[in-house]
C-alpha cells in the first residue's frame, strides 16, 4: 500500500472527506434544533413523558410536604401543591381511608398517594396498575422521602385496596 502522498491523498481520500463533511454539515443542525428550542426528542424523554401530574393537598404550615414534592420532581414528576385548611377532610373527600392518614394526600392519575411514599413505588404502581385506591405510608416515618433523618426507621408502603384493606407493597 502506498503512503498517503500528496497525489494519493488528493485523488482517493479528499473526495470522501469532502462528502462526509458536507453530509455532517447538513445533518447536525437538524439534530441540534430540538435541543436549541428547549424540547427533548421523544426517545430521550422516555417514560417521563408518561408520568401524570401529582396534585398534592397539604397544610400550609407543613414543610416536609414540600421536601416530598421536591423528591418527586427529582424523579421526573411534575407536582402541583394545594394548601388546604383541613387535610383529613381533603383526604376523606378524595377517598383515602382515615386509618392510613399522614400529613398530605395526593392524586396521581387514577390513584391516591397518602404520605411520604417513595417515587419509585409510585412509578411501580403506575406501571402495574392494580385495582386499588392507591398507596400509603401512614404517619411520617423518619427516613422516608421528605423526612430524611440521621436515624431512619424501617417502614412499609401499603397498597390500599378498594375495600379499604391494605397489604404491603414495598418495604424500606
Language-model regions: role of each:
Residues 93-172:
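Thiol/selenol-based redox catalytic cores and closely related redox-interacting motifs
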Residues 3-18:
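Bacterial N-terminal signal peptides that target proteins for export
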Residues 30-34, 42:
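Boundary at the C-terminal end of the N-terminal hydrophobic targeting segment
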Residues 51, 77-78, 131-133:
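Loop/turn elements at helix/coil->beta-strand transitions in domains of secreted/extracellular proteins
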Residues 15-29:
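Bacterial N-terminal signal peptides
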Residues 61, 68, 83-86, 118-122:
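Stable alpha-helical elements in mature extracytoplasmic
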Residues 47-69, 75:
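Local sequence-structure signature of Cys/Sec-based thiol-disulfide redox active-site neighborhoods
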Residues 69-89:
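Conserved helix-turn-beta segment immediately C-terminal to the redox Cys motif
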Amino acid at each position: 500500500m502506498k503512503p498517503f502522498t500528496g497525489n494519493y491523498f488528493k485523488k482517493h481520500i479528499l473526495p470522501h472527506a469532502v462528502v462526509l463533511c458536507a453530509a455532517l454539515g447538513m445533518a447536525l443542525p437538524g439534530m441540534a434544533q430540538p435541543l436549541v428550542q428547549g424540547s427533548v426528542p421523544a426517545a430521550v424523554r422516555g417514560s417521563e413523558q408518561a408520568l401524570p401530574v401529582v396534585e398534592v393537598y397539604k397544610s400550609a404550615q407543613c414543610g416536609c410536604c414540600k421536601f416530598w414534592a421536591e423528591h418527586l420532581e427529582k424523579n421526573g414528576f411534575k407536582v402541583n401543591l394545594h394548601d388546604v385548611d383541613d387535610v383529613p377532610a381533603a383526604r376523606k373527600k378524595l377517598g383515602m381511608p382515615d386509618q392510613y392518614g399522614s400529613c398530605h394526600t395526593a392524586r396521581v392519575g387514577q390513584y391516591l398517594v397518602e404520605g411520604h411514599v417513595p417515587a419509585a413505588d409510585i412509578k411501580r404502581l403506575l406501571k402495574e396498575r392494580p385495582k386499588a385506591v392507591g398507596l400509603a405510608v401512614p404517619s411520617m416515618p423518619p427516613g422516608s422521602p421528605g423526612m430524611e433523618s440521621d436515624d431512619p426507621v424501617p417502614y412499609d408502603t401499603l397498597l390500599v385496596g378498594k375495600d379499604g384493606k391494605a397489604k404491603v407493597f414495598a418495604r424500606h
